[in-house]
Amino acid sequence: MADYKEYLDKIRNSQLLYFDSFPLDMTSCEYNVHLLLNKMAESRKSYLLLMDNERFSDAVLIAGHLLENAAVINYISASLQEDNTKQISKYLARETVQTLCDLFKFVGDDNVDAETQETIDFIMDDFKSRCDIVVLKKAKQTHEELVQVISKATTNSEKFKIIKNNYELPVVEDYLRPLRTDLSKFYGFPDIDKKLVLFYSSYCKIKHCGAAMYAPILCEDKVVMNKSQYRDLSPIVVWMCLEYTEKNIKTILNKVCQKR
């Protein structure tokens, strides 16, 4: 298997599509896929910049972000291929729940400006129409009843608590597992699934723990960290995600456009 520099060269030569603008008549699936493709293209540039400057642990964060985007694109594409509208509805509904929770958490109970309130109202309308039984947990109340409870809540923190306790949030592993399976079949390298699990575990540790996850060694009054672990870990993951998405991009875009 190639060393990390060879994979970096392959990543440099990647030609993943980037969209400067989106058509106004896009469906939700089209918009999400185009947006995720742009995020992957932008992540590729940031990743190479960090690797070239030996910011290996920071590069892992970008690589993990790229992997998650590739996984969601693959998930949407597979659901469309199987004509599994329930899975697509579930994905979009969970994302709506997450967006609404993030908004309520970010805004808090302070007075909000008109523009922010307009955004909240817009997402709430989407939530009311989209987040029915598809993402409702085993609650005693129906979606319609919970919408009424939320509308009567006087603070954003109350609304946040009601939504979080009664509706499903996105589960990253649901998106990652199918991509791991598909990459293993596509490339046929030994232990690809294990490498991806190891990488994602390391990504989550860096993401949530930062520098505290390192085991520094004191040497001549200097803190020395093992960079090679992160230097060698991420390039193959980034390359596989980019190449696999590139090779399937026409099929993916055809699928989402057919659902207009």
Language-model regions: role of each:
Residues 1-31, 94-239, 244-260:
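Secondary-shell segments that build the walls of catalytic and ion/ligand-binding clefts
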Residues 21-79:
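Long, hydrophobic/aromatic-enriched structural stretches that serve as scaffold segments
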Residues 58, 77, 84-85, 214, ...:
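Residue-level signal for alpha-helical context at structural boundaries
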Residues 63-64, 70-110:
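Internal, hydrophobic cores of structured domains that mediate oligomerization or house catalytic pockets
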